[in-house]
């Protein structure tokens, strides 16, 4: 069963504002580069970095959570994280973020490596913290995901990891 990742309003507003600012900055760089062709390489590098950043964060953003008989799968725009059910030690609701170590704390959601006092280092792929849940693996690795009907996903995974 596949469940869509929803975006909370805060993340949607941050994404729109960041996109407007980055597009404006790219436009300003292009405008300035036209007047200063001797600095065109510098502006091209700045534009490439800004464009790559927004594209990369979009491509790794979460789109859906899928649950089947053998695994929990977090689908990104490009790629997926597959967690075999036998690797899951614990799954429970979890609605708080942490200190961002590497990633995005608002652009397309909360995505990347985070840490906090409660669960330590963990990876977040969250669109809406009111629908978030923590997955702890036997290896100690931790993920925070979110999706619609997260309570049903938690219940289904729990019933399958106990068997």
Language-model region placement:
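Non-transmembrane, membrane-adjacent beta-strand/coil modules in membrane-associated proteins
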Residues: 2, 75-139
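Short, surface-exposed linear segments at secondary-structure transitions and domain or protein termini
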Residues: 13, 91-97, 151-160
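Transmembrane alpha-helices and immediately adjacent membrane-cytoplasm interface residues
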Residues: 45-63
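Membrane-helix interface/capping segments
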Residues: 61-78, 85
């Amino acid at each position: 069963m596949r469940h869509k990742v929803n975006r909370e309003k805060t993340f949607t507003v941050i994404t729109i504002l960041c996109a407007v600012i980055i597009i404006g900055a790219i436009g300003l760089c292009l405008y300035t580069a036209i007047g200063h062709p001797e600095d065109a390489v510098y502006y091209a590098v700045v534009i490439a970095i800004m464009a790559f950043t927004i594209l990369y964060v979009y491509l790794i953003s979460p789109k859906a959570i899928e649950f089947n008989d053998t695994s929990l799968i977090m689908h990104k725009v490009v790629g997926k994280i597959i967690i075999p059910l036998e690797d899951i030690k614990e799954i429970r609701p979890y609605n708080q973020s942490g200190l961002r170590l590497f990633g995005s704390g608002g652009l397309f959601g909360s995505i990347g490596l985070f840490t906090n006092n409660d669960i330590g280092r963990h990876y977040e792929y969250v669109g809406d913290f009111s629908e978030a849940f923590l997955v702890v693996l036997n290896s100690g690795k931790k993920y925070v995901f979110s999706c619609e009907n997260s309570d049903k996903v938690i219940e289904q995974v729990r019933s399958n990891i106990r068997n």
